Amino acid sequence: MTIMRKSHPLMKIVNHDFIDLPTPPNISGWWNFGSLLGLCLILQIFTGLFLAMHYTSDTLTAFSSVTHICRDVNYGWLIRYMHANGASLFFMCLYIHIGRGIYYGSYLYTETWNIGILLLFLTMATAFMGYVLPWGQMSFWGATVITNLLSAMPYIGQDLVEWIWGGFSVDKATLTRFFALHFITPFIITAMIMVHLLFLHETGSNNPLGLPSNCGKVPFHPYYTTKDFMGVILLLTLFMTLVLFFPDKLGDPDNYTPANPLNTPPHIKPEWYFLFAYAILRSIPNKLGGVMALAFSILVLALLPYLHTSKQRSLSFRPLSQTLFWMLVSDVIALTWIGGLPVESPYIMIGQVASVLYFSIILIFMPIAGLIENKMLKL
């Protein structure tokens, strides 16, 4: 008699993807972040669902409804802080996941990689809309500044901005539609993740060596379920430490002031996970140029499969490319730091240098390093 997990139509899908999935025997802890992202998404959907039960998407009551959640709802403060810090955790895992993909050459699975970039855009849009919902000072002004960037688009820019706003400024219509979209996008992300996994399981996982491992694959369960569970325990420990001891560490104090269109905060900035892109946007004096650089800072990832010049897939045995990779990581950290600082000297110059370096490493230096390494290794 066949085992139920191998014969039942629904169980067969689960079995194929999470139990009997052939997996390379040597994948390291850097491969844990895919499953951790799944955990973060589940956390965000459930905490968001409970918050939506008490939240009101009206400009007059949005701020006080968030206060009501924290003060009057049973464990409302915990749900609210889990949701707010869960977004930070999500992006931390997401950036590590992308970094691992770049380091080990996972971008050569082009379909999986491109779906991943689409997922990144969707996640960024979801997080941005969520940041607007508490209707604090930074929520309101962040929404005004970031949506207003679309007006830089020739011909249709101003009409597009007014269409998104639902009027001539960020107001009740904007808040209502942002709430509706913020609620639905996680489910679109979930569907896209299914497609992401579908393409990944067509090719199989990459490994640290970047070599085919078909001859030595092992089943996903129990080896990697145990390994992933260890990652889950560590992540939840870090997460609950942040939520229970430092809940406001990653937030902005200005967001504890209700939105006031007549009073502009001294320094408008998005959440920390958007600061690197915000720094690139600010480093170009021209509005349209800045918006294009902002979009291209993410879209440049889609060019990686076509800029791969090395005969080796992974960076494991390529010291020159490794150096450039860690320079890129340092540069993104520097951009994140600069994005949170005021627009004044010397920060403007540092931001411009870091922005040029960001694109130069990806578009020029890494492809050249690949060719040099081929030459040195006589490949």
Swiss-Prot record:
Keywords: Electron transport, Heme, Iron, Membrane, Metal-binding, Mitochondrion, Mitochondrion inner membrane, Respiratory chain, Transmembrane, Transmembrane helix, Transport, Ubiquinone. It is a multi-pass membrane protein. Its cofactor is heme b. It comes from the Eukaryota. Heme b b566 binds at residues 97, 196. CDD domains: cytochrome_b_C, Cytochrome_b_N. The chain crosses the membrane at residues 33-53, 77-98, 113-133, 178-198, 226-246, 288-308, 320-340, 347-367. One of its GO terms (cellular component) is respiratory chain complex III. Binds 2 heme b groups non-covalently. A ubiquinone binds at residue 201. Component of the ubiquinol-cytochrome c reductase complex (complex III or cytochrome b-c1 complex) that is part of the mitochondrial respiratory chain. The b-c1 complex mediates electron transfer from ubiquinol to cytochrome c. Contributes to the generation of a proton gradient across the mitochondrial membrane that is then used for ATP synthesis. Belongs to the cytochrome b family. The cytochrome bc1 complex contains 11 subunits: 3 respiratory subunits (MT-CYB, CYC1 and UQCRFS1), 2 core proteins (UQCRC1 and UQCRC2) and 6 low-molecular weight proteins (UQCRH/QCR6, UQCRB/QCR7, UQCRQ/QCR8, UQCR10/QCR9, UQCR11/QCR10 and a cleavage product of UQCRFS1). This cytochrome bc1 complex then forms a dimer. Heme 1 (or BL or b562) is low-potential and absorbs at about 562 nm, and heme 2 (or BH or b566) is high-potential and absorbs at about 566 nm. PANTHER family: CYTOCHROME B. This is Cytochrome b. It comes from Cratogeomys goldmani rubellus (Goldman's pocket gopher).
